[in-house]
Structures are given as structure tokens and as C-alpha cells.
UniProtKB/Swiss-Prot annotation:
EC number(s) recorded for this UniProt protein: 3.4.-.-
Record-stated family: Belongs to the peptidase U62 family.
UniProt keyword Hydrolase present: yes
Superkingdom of origin organism: Archaea
Any Gene Ontology biological process: proteolysis
SUPFAM superfamilies: Putative modulator of DNA gyrase, PmbA/TldD (SSF111283)
Keywords: Hydrolase, Metalloprotease, Protease
Descriptive protein name: Metalloprotease AF_0655
GO molecular function: metallopeptidase activity
Stored Pfam families: PmbA_TldD_1st, PmbA_TldD_2nd, PmbA_TldD_3rd
PANTHER family: METALLOPROTEASE SLR0863, UNCHARACTERIZED PROTEIN TLDD AND PMBA
Length: 425
């Protein structure tokens, strides 16, 4: 047996949903699960079950039934972490949390034909040990609210806002501002213009630029994709891949939604500079990909006790020196795009296509009419070679899916000016 590890994960979660003023049945879940891995003759054996450690490892070893080329970076980590919060939501009543949703729904009700609000909290406790001598334990709490409304005018439009971070109920301080943003924007959006089309100058807001760096670039630097040859960045370490103003970072130590103190292979979390001054400096690694490619481990994550795979955490474009008004002036004529409604990317080709929540025409360096149903597409590396970056960064929370697993992440960026193709969504 070359290597073994054991993970025990406890999850305690509460989900409340208020749809059109009606409360759905609260969903409370508490689960404990154990995952076992054994590396034998270069092949991984996996077993999941709430059994004694020796039995779990025996079952995992039985599943390592052939030979392979697997290997792992030997790292021994010892540590404990417990998140301190100002207001533990588990000390509060469900009624108080429901009342918050009702108050937020009242704010947006008059501008919506339908509403949906969700409150959630999740406490994750991970215990990890391995044959290298690692012994790690941590507890992290995440809390959040999402607010969604549909409005009707010349068109039917959907708008959503979220406030989610690691921490206790204090995370939701000021969440009513998100509701008031919907009240401000949605009545204008339902009567907004159709967007222009063609290649043009685009200013992405922090939210859309964050989605861009996560989806279009971040997945391309995950080392399992590199090993599979499924990324345009394979073989390009220490090459210039972007404008000198571009620095891209993945940092799980930031107190954002993608925070973790140790990854799911027991490696202590640390800030990773992926691109520095336009030069590709590193990929994101698990212990196995770090061994094969010579990188630094610490980005192996899993949902529950599923097999850990290479994932992002809090990924962002670092700040530069342009103010927002200066970006508009540099743009002169084009569009300003706000928020994201999803899209698609292909790390192997660098192509991406995203839908913004809404936007504004930019005329003579100033914001003009609002536009709706607008999309953005282009080639990731071509866009990054010709950008101007703002100086005020914001982060957006979300869940990232890969290989059937969802993990919490954040992406962030200042506003970014680029050239891209714009069209209808």
C-alpha cells in the first residue's frame, strides 16, 4: 500500500424558501459520512461508508484491483481550525429567519409578478488523517440569502441578487440593500432596449468579470485538465498569456464564500498567484497532479466525501489603477454589462459565451440607455491580451459544478474594459 487517507465529514444545513409569499416546508439536514482512499500499485481504491477505520481501508484496498500510474505528493500537515462567528444562526429561531425573508419579499413585491427568496446555512466539519502523518480538523459555517424576482413590461425579465459568505447571521447585515437594487433596476429592465450586436468595446462589471475569470480562465488552469490536454494553457507556464496589467489569484484564505483552511487532502490553504503581470505562473493542483507536474498542492476539494478533485476557491483578477469613470472614457462608445445569467466555456479552445443580467449603452464615455437580454462571447486569451482594469474589486458567491460535485466558490474582479462580441441572449 503506497498511501491511504480517511475523511470524516459532518454537514448540518437548513434551507428556507419563500415563493410568492408562501413558505415551503423547511428543509433541515444533518449527515455524517466517511470516505477512504488507498493508493496501491499506482491505482486508487475508494470506499465510502460509516464503518471502523480499519474496515474502511480494507474495503478501499480491495477496490484497488489493478495497476495504474497514480502517485501522490507526500505532505504531512497537522492543524485545527474553528470559525468564530458573531451570531450563530443555530442559536436563532426559524421564525426569525422566515421573518427576514418576508421583510425582503415585501420590499420587492410591488415590482414583481413572481418572487422567490431562499435562506440557507451550512456547517461543515472535516476530520482528515493519512499515512503521511497528517491530522487535520476544521469547522466552517456559511450563511446566505438569495432574492429573485420576475417583472413584466414590454418583456418578461428575471433579476436575482445574493448575499452569501462564510460566517454567521452577521453575514446578512444590510441584505435589504440587495432587495432595493431589484426595486431600482427591474422596472427599467422590463422596458429596456434590445442590445446592439457585433464586436465592440465592453466594460464588464465586477460580477461579470468575476464569472469570466472563473469560468473562462480558472477552469483552464486546473491541473487535471492540463494532464488531460483539455486546456489552451497546457505547456505555457512562464509564458505571457495576458496584458501586463493582468494578475489572477486563487486564495482560499480570504473570508469569502470559497474559503477553506485546509483542502480535502489535508493540505493547508494558501494564496496561489496564477498569472502575475500577464505571465502564467502556476496551475491549481491536488497532491496527485502536483506530483506529476511539479506544482504546489492545496486545491483538492470534494462535495461530502466524494473523491477530491482540483477545484478553485476564491478566484479573482487583482486591481489595477483605472477608476470606473476612466474606463467609460477609455471605452468611449460601447456597452457596460452587469451581472451574469450563466453561459458556457470550452477550456480546450478558450471560447466562451456568457449572458449578462442587463447592461447600458455607453455613448461619448457616459452611461446611456439600458439594454436587456444581452450576451458576451469571445476567446479568453485574445481578450486578456487587450484589457484595462479598474481599481475597485468586488466578490460574488456561488456554487461551482464539476464531475457531478458542487462546491462553494467566490469570484471577483474590478470592472474590466475589453473588446468582445456582443449580441442578444
Amino acid at each position: 500500500m503506497r498511501f491511504w487517507d480517511i475523511r470524516r465529514v459532518e454537514n448540518v444545513s437548513l434551507n428556507l424558501q419563500l415563493e410568492n409569499g408562501k413558505l415551503e416546508k423547511p428543509r433541515y439536514n444533518k449527515s455524517t459520512s466517511k470516505g477512504f482512499r488507498v493508493l496501491k500499485n499506482g491505482f486508487w481504491g475508494i470506499f465510502e461508508g460509516n464503518v471502523a477505520d480499519d474496515e474502511g481501508l480494507r474495503q478501499a484496498e480491495k477496490n484497488a484491483f489493478t495497476q495504474g500510474d497514480g502517485d501522490i505528493e507526500e505532505i504531512a500537515t497537522k492543524g485545527r481550525y474553528r470559525m468564530r462567528v458573531k451570531r450563530d444562526p443555530q442559536d436563532m429561531s426559524i421564525e426569525e429567519k422566515v421573518e427576514l425573508l418576508k421583510d425582503l419579499e415585501k420590499i420587492i413585491r410591488d415590482v414583481c409578478v413572481s418572487t422567490k427568496l431562499v435562506y440557507f446555512e451550512n456547517r461543515r466539519v472535516l476530520q482528515y488523517r493519512d499515512s503521511c502523518g497528517s491530522e487535520v480538523e476544521y469547522e466552517v459555517l456559511r450563511t446566505g440569502v438569495s432574492i429573485m424576482g420576475v417583472g413584466k413590461g414590454r418583456s418578461l425579465q428575471f433579476l436575482s441578487k445574493r448575499q452569501m459568505r462564510v460566517g454567521g447571521y452577521e453575514v446578512l447585515d444590510g441584505v435589504d440593500e440587495k432587495a432595493y437594487e431589484i426595486v431600482e433596476v427591474l422596472p427599467k429592465l422590463v422596458n429596456a432596449l434590445a442590445p446592439p450586436s457585433g464586436e465592440m468595446s465592453v466594460v464588464m462589471d465586477s460580477s461579470l468579470a468575476g464569472v469570466f475569470v472563473h469560468e473562462a480562465f480558472g477552469h483552464a488552469v486546473e491541473a487535471d485538465h492540463v494532464l488531460q490536454g483539455a486546456t489552451v494553457l497546457k505547456g505555457r507556464l512562464n509564458e505571457k498569456v495576458a496584458d501586463e496589467s493582468v494578475t489572477i489569484i486563487d486564495d482560499p484564505t480570504l473570508p469569502e464564500f470559497g474559503f477553506f483552511p485546509f483542502d480535502d487532502e489535508g493540505v493547508r490553504a494558501e494564496k496561489k498567484v496564477i498569472v502575475e503581470d500577464g505571465v502564467l505562473k502556476s496551475f491549481l493542483h491536488s497532491r496527485e497532479t502536483a506530483k506529476k507536474l511539479g506544482g504546489v498542492a492545496g486545491n483538492a476539494r470534494s462535495q461530502g466525501v466524494d473523491v477530491p478533485i482540483v477545484r478553485m476557491s476564491n478566484t479573482y483578477i487583482d486591481t489595477h489603477h483605472y477608476s470606473f469613470d476612466e474606463l467609460l472614457e477609455e471605452c468611449r462608445d460601447g456597452v457596460y454589462l452587469v451581472g451574469s445569467r450563466g453561459g458556457e466555456t470550452n477550456p480546450a479552445t478558450g471560447y466562451f459565451h456568457f449572458n449578462a443580467q442587463y447592461g447600458y449603452l455607453i455613448k461619448n464615455g457616459e452611461l446611456a440607455e439600458m439594454v436587456r437580454d444581452v450576451s458576451l462571447s469571445g476567446n479568453t486569451l485574445e481578450i486578456l491580451r487587450n484589457v484595462k482594469i479598474g481599481r475597485e474589486i468586488e466578490f460574488d458567491p456561488g456554487f461551482c459544478g464539476k464531475a457531478g460535485q458542487l462546491v462553494p466558490v467566490s469570484d471577483g474582479s474590478p470592472p474590466v474594459l475589453c473588446r468582445a462580441t456582443v449580441g442578444g441572449a
